[in-house]
Swiss-Prot record:
It is found in: Secreted. The record marks R60 as: Key residue for activity on mammalian channels, it controls twisting and flexibility of active residues at the C-terminus. This is Alpha-like toxin BeM9. Belongs to the long (4 C-C) scorpion toxin superfamily. Sodium channel inhibitor family. Alpha subfamily. Disulfide bonds join C12-C65, C16-C38, C24-C48, C28-C50.
Length: 66
């Protein structure tokens, strides 16, 4: 497991807008992570960051989102 931006197919992040909201935590835990939160103005803009996301779940890697 690792801490990372969870990715949709095609290497795109899940955008989020409310750092206090539960959207990212729900998304991350549904995918097996310990927790997650909305990182505002991070490397990929406002995106969901997951803590201890299982290795089989795709994460945002360098390169284009397409």
């Amino acid at each position: 497991a690792r801490d990372a931006y969870i990715a949709k197919p095609h290497n795109c992040v899940y955008e989020c807008y409310n750092p206090k909201g539960s959207y990212c935590n729900d998304l991350c835990t549904e995918n097996g992570a310990e927790s997650g939160y909305c990182q505002i103005l991070g490397k990929y803009g406002n995106a969901c960051w997951c803590i201890q996301l299982p290795d089989n779940v795709p994460i945002r890697i360098p390169g284009k989102c397409h």
